[in-house]
Amino acid sequence: MSVLGELDLLGPRAHGAACGEAVLKAVAEDFQVDEVLDIPLSGEGEHLWLWVEKRGLNTEEAARRLGRAAGVQQKHVSYAGLKDRQALTRQWFSLHLPGKADPDLGAAEGEDLRILRRTRHSRKLQRGAHAANGFTLRLTALRAERVLLDARLERIAAVGVPNYFGLQRFGHGGGNLVDARSCAEQDLLPANRNLRSRFLSAGRSYLFNRLLAERVAEGSWNRAAVGDLLAFTDSRSFFLAGEEECRDARLAALDLHPTGPLWGEGDPPSGAGVLERELALAGSEPALCRWLAKAGMAHERRILRLPIQGLAWHYPEPDVLQLEFVLPAGCFATVVVREILDLVPTGQTENPCAY
């Protein structure tokens, strides 16, 4: 099986070659994520909400540990989104405990998991309920000209970056996409729910990245065209762009963006040349598109441009760059870093890593 690399799975950079190289995730504290949840919690109800800090632990394993400690089935443990294992992350979980007192969750805690806050609420935590994620990244072993770095950072703060799905979505060496293609060619869906979700997500993400890569290559990823479907940064609804909509000042303000397809049943609702491009993409991947439609996936949209909120940076040491920013839920910090620096594995200073 051939290993798929960064250009196979993502696409070209929008802002030119990387300004240099650095190491990310030398330790978990170098990649910190804080979930941003805009839900007022009532303090009462049959759902126990937990604000959890975890280190070197993925979200699914943390959920299993919390469920075991609470004595509840996994279906009664909820979280808004998956967070990286190789990171220090803080996120919410909820446990459904109707008629039960708060359980002793000490068995779930350890050096890699701490419960920072507990409160009650009337509803469970829904997937995708978080509004955003706040990131603090520490890039070490930095080799780059600071003047070039500062100029690039100012540029992406002003205009954003392509909203690619990150390499994490596709598994090691693109393995999730390889498996998705195999399932599509055989017209089957894995019985295991987690595998099914992982493969369907990889297939949709790849098609989106293909479309975005085309628009980055021609310089239209951040400009609206007649026939585009436009969406606001934090909205899942969209509307068709005519000539007047293409002149909307909110596009220049990075509040409104062109979108690309998350493939599902039926043709995309885009128009004009945009629809032609998206149908041509589907024609180049017929098995994958049929498979996604047959799986009952609804056709959705994702913004092509990723605005970076509150981007700040400094150099705590001569060879360390620290970044702080906020991204909408479902967006990848690594695609921001990719527009700035090449990442190299710990202990190396050559050859960009493939993850």
From Swiss-Prot:
GO BP term, example: tRNA pseudouridine synthesis
A cellular component annotation (GO) from this entry: cytosol
Active site (record annotation): 84
Record keyword tRNA processing present: yes
CDD domains tied to this protein: PseudoU_synth_EcTruD
Recorded catalytic activity of this chain's protein: uridine(13) in tRNA = pseudouridine(13) in tRNA
Gene3D superfamilies in the cross-refs: TruD, catalytic domain (3.30.2350.20), TruD, insertion domain (3.30.2340.10)
InterPro entries to which the protein is assigned, alphabetical: PsdUridine_synth_cat_dom_sf, PsdUridine_synth_TruD, PsdUridine_synth_TruD_CS, PsdUridine_synth_TruD_insert, TruD_catalytic, TruD_insert_sf, TruD_pseudoU_synthase
Keywords linked to the UniProt accession: Isomerase, tRNA processing
Domain TRUD: 160-306
Family annotation (HAMAP family): TruD
Family: Belongs to the pseudouridine synthase TruD family.
Protein known as: tRNA pseudouridine synthase D
Organism whose genome encodes this protein: Pseudomonas paraeruginosa (strain DSM 24068 / PA7)
